[in-house]
Amino acid sequence: MRLSLVLALLPVAFGAPTRRDEPAPLHVPRDVDSLIKDTYIVKYKDITAFSAVDEGLKLLSGKPKHIYKGAFKGFSGKIDAKTLELLRDDPSVDFIEQDAIVTLAAYTTQASAPWGLARISTRQRGPTGYTYDDSAGAGTCSYIIDTGIQANHPNFGGRAFQLVSYQGSNADGNGHGTHVAGTIGSTTYGVAKRTTLLGVKVLSDSGSGSTSGIIAGINYVVSDSRSRSCPNGSVANMSLGGGYSASLNSAAKSLIDNNIFLAVAAGNENQNAANVSPASEPTVCTVGATTSADAKASFSNYGSGVDIFAPGQSILSTWIGSSTNTISGTSMASPHIAGLAAYLAGLEGFPGAQALCNRIVALATTGVITGLPSGTPNRLAFNGNPSG
């Protein structure tokens, strides 16, 4: 009797579907306009016979939205929670992803934008709107190596994080870093309005710091970037500098070597940028400052090592205390380029750290800046706006 009972159960056991050890991955798309409720795309493994897809279709309570019989094998449709669980247990299923709304990439214009934003989205001086693709740096990370950032500033929209401090308190007690972060990626004052902003504090609340501390901050960025999800790449900004330092230049180069784009301020001494660091490091993107009249800002450093110029005088941006401030310097020009790097990486993909600087140089408006000393490249940043 015992033997016959076991034998009687065998056909049932053999007829049961095989279960997998772990459920198939369930993906939720990021940075989309909207998700479609209870609607999923079921992707089967490439080696799966289509009969397995047919078996999955039988689980649906209604008609499928699409059946895929080509290179992409599977189906889509409304799937309730119980059926979703059954499908995820099917070893033939590769993954399941929630359906989402996808729209044409569109350019949008921010009316009455800060003058610096307006200037980098047009070839000619005059327009007051900032025109940009609404990808806006999505999927990128922007490291601000500075005085820290006020991460909870309302204009950062929850996209900002103060990570670490090598100078006392983790808070930005100066305002400089928060201003820089705002130009890179704040909602109102930023170039790349969807980038993630990451603060690394290497300067004190009085605005000073040691070379050794800055190097420690750079090493932190390299380490952090390896474990952080930034699918469209990472950029960094250093709106700081001092006399020539082989150590600081070497540390700045290590960011490039680790495929992190770096924009640095050319300096505010009205001298050759070859005399200061990290602006003199050849592999970084060194940024000089211009005025709203397209003249070299009187304070801006210059020379053949300046890759690009960007707005840097009377720049309105975020400030500590959840406020705003208008200040000047190549410190304000550099984040326009860090933001532009994040913007282009989100729009076109990340081509590599040095290649991204080359892309910015290639896009630049040439020959419009007045007052440049001989030998200084006459290149003003431009975001590639097709109507610009």
UniProtKB/Swiss-Prot annotation:
The elicitor proteolytic activity is completely inhibited by PMSF. The activity is also significantly reduced by aprotinin (leading to 37% residual activity), by leupeptin (leading to 54% residual activity), by the ovomucoid trypsin inhibitor (leading to 65% residual activity), and by p-aminobenzamidine (leading to 26% residual activity). GO terms for cellular component: extracellular region. InterPro entries: PCSK9_ProteinaseK-like (IPR034193), Peptidase_S8/S53_dom (IPR000209), Peptidase_S8/S53_dom_sf (IPR036852), Peptidase_S8_Asp-AS (IPR023827), Peptidase_S8_His-AS (IPR022398), Peptidase_S8_Ser-AS (IPR023828), Peptidase_S8_subtilisin-like (IPR050131), Peptidase_S8_subtilisin-rel (IPR015500). It is found in: Secreted. AsES can be combined well with commercial spray adjuvants, insecticides, herbicides and fungicides without losing any defense-inducing activity. The agricultural biostimulant PSP1, a formulation based on AsES is therefore a very promising candidate to efficiently control multiple fungal diseases under field conditions in monocot and dicot crops. The keyword Disulfide bond applies. PROSITE patterns: SUBTILASE, SUBTILASE_ASP, SUBTILASE_HIS, SUBTILASE_SER. It holds the Pfam family Peptidase_S8. Its main location: secreted. Residues 1-15 form the signal peptide. The record marks 268 as: Important for catalytic activity. Belongs to the peptidase S8 family. This is Subtilisin-like serine protease AsES. It comes from Sarocladium strictum. The gene is AsES.
